[in-house]
Amino acid sequence: MLNKLKNLLVEEMDVNSELITLEAELMNDLGFNSLELADLVVLCEEKFNIIFDESVLPTLLTVGDVVAYLEENA
């Protein structure tokens, strides 16, 4: 799932692939702002055919958090 998310981040959000690790923080390390986080959620929902529970969104701080959520729910 990390590779799928990594491809999405690189291709759709123009993130440098070298920055993408499970520990990378979306806002601090990848430079996302709140709008880009919302875009990421929408892209993941479309690509992986899931709906993110709004209550979990504030807990998605790292790439690893997103990967774990996708693995549990996709």
Label the model's feature ranges.
Residues M13-G31, F48-L61:
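Phosphopantetheine carrier-protein modules
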Residues M1-E18, E71-N73:
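Thiotemplate assembly-line natural product biosynthesis machinery
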Residues E36:
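Two-component histidine kinase catalytic core, primarily the HATPase_c
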